Amino acid sequence: MKAKNLFAILAVGTAMFTQAQNQKDVKAIKAMTGCYDVSFNFAETFIHQKEYEKKKNYRSGALEWITVAEESPKKIELQHILIVNPQGSGKDAIVKHWRQDWKFENTDLHVFDKGSQWKFKKLPAESVKGQWTQMVYQVDDAPRYSGTGTWVHLDGRTYWESAADAPLPRREYTTRKDYNVLVRGNHQEIFDWGWIHDQDNKKILRKDGAADETIVEEKGLEYYKKVDDAKCIIAQNYWKEYSPLWKTVRQTWDEELAKNKDLSVTPDVEDIFLYKDLMKLTPKQNKEAKELVKKYIVN
């Protein structure tokens, strides 16, 4: 009887610890929302090819609004919206930027392979116990990369780490042909002033039937410094108006991804990229949005 009571006490204690940990995780994820002055900084570091010459360092910055697009007990969707014209208004003043979804104890991933192909991967439930999968999506809500890891709350720090294969970043998508996979080492950490996306990346050339070839390594530091929400009012107004349209886009992609199979998409149709087609739509053109997404899916 005493043993049973001990097991019951241990079970209750474990459940309470898990719930407390989960609440800290959710708080950390939501701490990334708000209006931010963002600086993007990238520098190539270690060269793996003898005749390779390092490219110039990349630096850029912008105002960015991050908001909870949708939320359920085991999923939080954070939408990023860049402000490209602070004096403008509507969709001409913003870029509907990337999205990060966080799923608790998720077992289903679409892992980037190369080109415009993602492989479906099923993880054992025991391997993701207590973990959160970060699923990153492109400006058109197509998948980009996914990685799973545990939020750590220790010694006054709050951070999450994972690694993931990803397509080329937008800053090099049209200028680089010497590599086709960016292996991202992601570290996201929360501070009182905002948060940081710290990256240790490898630029990889991937070919069928051959081992991956590392071209060069890269260090990335993205600083998200919190500012007054009023500075992002343009993005907030845009999202209030257009969020139903983008919800339709997300749902259309989700329907395809829920099939739990490999995915291939075409980068453009008749030389027009999907995000450009989607940005032309008005807030109530949900049917047209759904049809557009399906047109870009190969299988």
Protein language model features and the residues they cover:
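Hydrophobic/aromatic beta-strand elements that line small-molecule binding cavities or substrate pockets
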Residues: K55-K56, S60-E70, Q79, Q100-D101, ...
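Short, His- and charge-rich active-site/binding loops that engage polyanionic ligands
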Residues: V84-F104
